[in-house]
Amino acid sequence: DSDFTYAAAMLHDIGIIECNAPGIECYGKHEYICHGTLGATMLRANSATWGITENEIEPYARVCERHTGTGLTYTQIIERELPLLPKDYIPETIEEQIICYADKFFSKSRPQQMKTVDGVIHSLRKFGEDGINIFCMWHEKFGI
């Protein structure tokens, strides 16, 4: 659904406003890694105000919370001691995967500069081979 994908892509980073990321003019109190789950919480909490049901907002909230890296697993959250509710945040739907894949090519600190595939792989390397393998699978599937 291209309309959903476009809207979800526009909303997926909304939680950044609650994070402490001065380099991109965000002065919240949470760590950057939390921006996806914070965005999902914001959407769920405000949906009624916007006249949107919980069921209607949920797919957008899922995109927010599942786009970090190539997804985060319960185990990764525990092992890395991330400040997130320990559970799986893995992109499942095609739309979640497309947005997560596309997001890897851009950085909030350099929004006009698109990364190369090698640049994305380099940035994912510090998190382990699993993320690289997922990205490469998506690249074969969606390839820019």
PLM features per residue range, with description:
Residues 1-119:
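Divalent metal-dependent catalytic cores for phosphoryl transfer on phosphate-bearing substrates
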